[in-house]
Amino acid sequence: MSLRPISLMLALLLTSAPALAQSAPTPPATVQTEPRETIEGTLSQERTVIGIPSFATASVQTVAGLRTDALGRQLADVIAADLERSGLFEPIGPNGVRAIGRAEVQAPRFGEWQARGAENVVHGFVDAGSNGSLIVGCYLYDTALGSELVRKGFEIQPADWRRAAHKCADAIYSRLSGEAPFFDSRVAYIAESGPKGNRIKRLAIMDSDGGNHRFITNGQALALSPRFSPDYKKIVYVSYLNDRVRVFIYDVASGTQRLVTESRNPTFAPRWSPDGTQILYSMAVGGNTDIYRISANGGTPVRLTTAPGIDVGGSFSPDGRKIVFESDRSGSQQLYVMNIDGSNQQRISFGGGRYATPEWSPRGDLIAFTRMGGGEFRIGVMTPSGGGVRMLTNGWQDEAPTWSPNGRVIQFFRTTPGREGRSSLWQVDLTGVNLRRLPTPQDGSDPSWGPVLP
């Protein structure tokens, strides 16, 4: 995969576009029944109107079967979809919007966009580069001030055009929201097919919006509980085959995998440490289920919990000093926090119902969880001390939250009622209002949202 950021001045030289050779301005530095705390930051139900016409091209060329004019429309489509999906923006275009010429990329008609109610406008271009590459440039403007806010340029291989669109959307989102980016990231999950009693479960990977989908495993073994490594390069997951339980690490670049540990005892829920050197997992031995820590290179595991009962679902804090997990030692599933050596185990959930599948936010400020009660499973968040509980979803069975790289959006899977209940992937932001379903070719469960790609 190749996506090389370049300056737009270099992009202009590479594409030899005299219309853009002029100097550019320098960019300036579901209804809930429970009360919610105020969320600090930019999350809001008010959306910024933003114009996004198709990207221009100096001359129509075909690169690796892609016409640059058609690709200009596709780039704008992906950027518009990304921004709209964030819940913060209301895109105008590219459908129903006049196509711009190359000379207009750096000379927007601000009055035209203001008349349509757009506070900002995105312009861009795509051209054939050297040696079969593509050059993509994108700009963000403030229509009221008539000023440039963002400029980005990339030299890419044609297969990576969607990544260029996500990178542009990330730059726009970050500039206007003040939040860290999250669009140019990937999701690993379990693709499910077949009857409920004999499900085929395969490890799969896709872009954060469902694009570029591919299956990793063939379905001969049951795949469960995938999790991206902090550097995105690997995925740890559990494989069940012939009464053997194995924890594998899959290398995303090479497509190879290696064994971390195996057992005939039920083993599940592997999780990476923030530095990528350690893995947590849960294993049932002699009627007791406990949390273990093992080197990512394998070796002898260290048992962290010893209380009678079931202790599962460990997740590291971003600083690597704490672990949140679930335990039924009190008589029902509740959340606990402990030090990484297993000491100082403290219960943090005290609301009604049972709590499970905790996941620490990459920002460190919240823990996402599944709460079970009244015949329903719902996704919520709380502070690491157990305060500020907010429920974000109202589905019949929503579970297994995973955080976006910037800690502002949560993905999970939802199962429909009935004997043949179908599972699908969803996401919701911290307002609990912006609920979306992710497209997948099959049923999906147990998502893992990876970090932003370099």
Swiss-Prot record:
The residues the entry assigns to the signal sequence are 1-21
Q: What gene is it encoded by?
A: tolB
The organism's lineage?
Answer: Bacteria, Pseudomonadati, Pseudomonadota, Alphaproteobacteria, Sphingomonadales
Could you tell me which species this protein originates from? Answer: Sphingopyxis alaskensis (strain DSM 13593 / LMG 18877 / RB2256)
What is the recorded name of this protein? Tol-Pal system protein TolB
Q: GO CC annotations? A: periplasmic space
| InterPro entries tied to this protein | 6-blade_b-propeller_TolB-like (IPR011042), PD40 (IPR011659), Tol-Pal_TolB (IPR014167), TolB_N (IPR007195)
GO terms in the biological process aspect are: cell division; protein import
Pfam families, per database record: PD40, TolB_N
Locations listed in the record: Periplasm
Q: Which UniProt keywords apply?
A: Cell cycle, Cell division, Periplasm, Signal
